């Protein structure tokens, strides 16, 4: 199943308002209507435009689609719905709304409608389950991992009358979407508390908390690491094995490097929602060795006499 970017299909920006979305849909519908267009793929493009407007023209579906886009789906590329996105158009009694794609069905089920009349909503019997709010601490490495993160949490149980009867532990494997940031809120549809008397499950809301890293500071998509250097390494140049989120790299330190200098390593930062990675900045820090014995102090004395170096010459200008 391939990902469909409905914004690209209609040719609008993700920030487009309802009026712009409707105008873009009308334009494409007129252009590719099978009774008007002679293009070979007109019918397919007409269906795509209808499907795109079915989603973007409905506030609830658009919000759900925007959540899905956070997982880094790219138009025309293979895609699998993340955990918690249930097909609600099957046995639940959704309305049949047209010839929609597998992608649409995997996200929205069969909840269709008239593009100009608004989508018809399924009415569920019983009482909807309670939403669950959790904070999820993640490490920087997990934002790049393709592995799922297992979480366990308590959800309330209710009887047929909707009265709480206790709690049960629920365990999920959650894929951390690319580009996630501290404080971001992720919704997992239908993964909250179970409904009663046939009602829909509640949702699980995860608030992301980035755990502090012992080596890296974060500046947007970029990472900063402090690289300690001995004075002779900074003066003569060297190669240093520098940690990154996905293994060590050999960093070349040029002669006459200065403390505080930053070296940029492209593509070793954090990923955005499209999977593109920021930079790693290696900030050099010259660390002085202890001069605790006479021979070491003598070497420093000899260096000071030979170098005749004054780091404060600019003060006399």
UniProtKB/Swiss-Prot annotation:
GO terms for molecular function: bent DNA binding; unfolded protein binding. Keywords: Chaperone, Cytoplasm, DNA-binding. PROSITE patterns: DNAJ_1 (PS00636), DNAJ_2 (PS50076). It comes from the Bacteria. Pfam families: DnaJ (PF00226), DnaJ_C (PF01556). One of its GO terms (biological process) is protein refolding. It is found in: Cytoplasm, Nucleoid. InterPro entries: DNA-bd_curved-DNA, DnaJ_C, DnaJ_domain, DnaJ_domain_CS, HSP40/DnaJ_pept-bd, J_dom_sf. Gene3D superfamilies: DnaJ domain, Single helix bin, Urease metallochaperone UreE, N-terminal domain. SUPFAM superfamilies: Chaperone J-domain, HSP40/DnaJ peptide-binding domain. Residues 5-69 form the J domain. One of its GO terms (cellular component) is cytoplasm. DNA-binding protein that preferentially recognizes a curved DNA sequence. It is probably a functional analog of DnaJ; displays overlapping activities with DnaJ, but functions under different conditions, probably acting as a molecular chaperone in an adaptive response to environmental stresses other than heat shock. Lacks autonomous chaperone activity; binds native substrates and targets them for recognition by DnaK. Its activity is inhibited by the binding of CbpM. This is Curved DNA-binding protein.
């Amino acid at each position: 199943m391939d990902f469909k970017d409905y914004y690209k299909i209609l040719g609008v920006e993700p920030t487009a308002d309802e009026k712009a979305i409707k105008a873009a849909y009308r334009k494409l519908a007129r252009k590719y209507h099978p009774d008007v267009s002679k293009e070979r793929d007109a019918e397919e493009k007409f269906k795509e435009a209808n499907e795109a407007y079915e989603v973007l023209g409905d506030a609830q579906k658009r919000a759900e689609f925007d959540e899905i886009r956070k997982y880094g789906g790219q138009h025309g590329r293979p895609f699998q719905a993340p955990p918690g996105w249930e097909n609600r158009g099957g046995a639940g009694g959704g309305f049949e709304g047209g010839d929609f794609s597998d992608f649409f069905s995997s996200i929205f089920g069969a909840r269709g409608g008239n593009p100009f009349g608004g989508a018809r909503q399924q009415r569920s019997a019983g009482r909807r389950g309670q939403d669950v709010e959790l904070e999820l601490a993640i490490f920087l490495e997990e934002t790049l991992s393709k592995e799922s993160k297992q979480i366990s949490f308590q959800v309330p149980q209710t009887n047929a009358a909707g009265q709480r009867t206790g709690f049960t532990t629920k365990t999920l494997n959650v894929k951390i979407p690319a580009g996630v940031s501290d404080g971001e809120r992720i919704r997992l549809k239908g993964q909250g508390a179970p409904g009663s008397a046939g009602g829909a499950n509640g949702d699980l809301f995860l608030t992301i908390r980035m755990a502090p890293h012992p080596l890296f500071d974060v500046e947007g998509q970029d990472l900063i690491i402090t690289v300690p250097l001995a004075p002779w390494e900074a003066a003569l140049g060297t190669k240093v094995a520098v940690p990154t989120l996905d293994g060590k790299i050999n960093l070349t330190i040029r002669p006459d490097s200065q403390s505080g200098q930053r070296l940029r390593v492209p593509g070793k930062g954090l990923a955005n929602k499209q999977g593109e990675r920021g930079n790693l900045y290696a900030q050099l820090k010259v660390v002085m060795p202890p001069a605790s014995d006479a021979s070491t102090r003598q070497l420093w004395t000899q260096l000071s006499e030979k170098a005749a170096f004054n780091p404060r010459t600019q003060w006399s200008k």
